Amino acid sequence: MAPKAAEKKPAEKKPAGKAPAEKLPKAEKKISKDAGGSEKKKKKSKKSVETYKIYIFKVLKQVHPDVGISGKAMGIMNSFINDIFEKLAQESSKLARYNKKPTITSREIQTAVRLVLPGELAKHAVSEGTKAVTKFTS
């Protein structure tokens, strides 16, 4: 919990003179982990951001091999997929809760797809999903 404003003490003002010799901070040695003494700077590892960009690109090349996609359009497609997956997860979670089941199964996902996606798109998604689950289990 953050301290309240009333509890903070104001900083003490000291004269701008020389500090006594005994109060000077001592120089600290940096001890490197490798015994060779060579100091190599470690590269800062980037945080991995999970996106669907490579999969979007693969599907694009399957459907239209001669067509490209801009970075902005790829970002929009990635956001779209994240949004759809979020809606499907929420809906399947609700369905599992309604039926008092602790687990989201393929049945809940399938029903969520039928509820979230419109008409013909839902039919195609269900058939592709069923095909993928069958391939995965066999």
UniProtKB/Swiss-Prot annotation:
One Pfam family, short name: Histone
Protein name in UniProt: Histone H2B.4
Entry's family note: Belongs to the histone H2B family.
Matching SMART domains: H2B
GO cellular component, one term: nucleus
Broad class of where this protein is predominantly found: nucleus
Organism: Arabidopsis thaliana (Mouse-ear cress)
Biased composition (Basic and acidic residues): 1-39
Localization: Nucleus; Chromosome
PTM entry text: Can be acetylated to form H2BK6ac, H2BK33ac and H2BK34ac.
Glycyl lysine isopeptide (Lys-Gly) (interchain with G-Cter in ubiquitin) crosslink, residue number(s): K135
Keyword annotations of the record: Acetylation, Chromosome, DNA-binding, Isopeptide bond, Methylation, Nucleosome core, Nucleus, Ubl conjugation
GO MF term set: DNA binding; protein heterodimerization activity; structural constituent of chromatin
Region (Disordered): 1-48
Superkingdom to which the source organism belongs: Eukaryota
Positions bearing N6,N6-dimethyllysine: K14
PROSITE patterns to which the protein is assigned, alphabetical: HISTONE_H2B
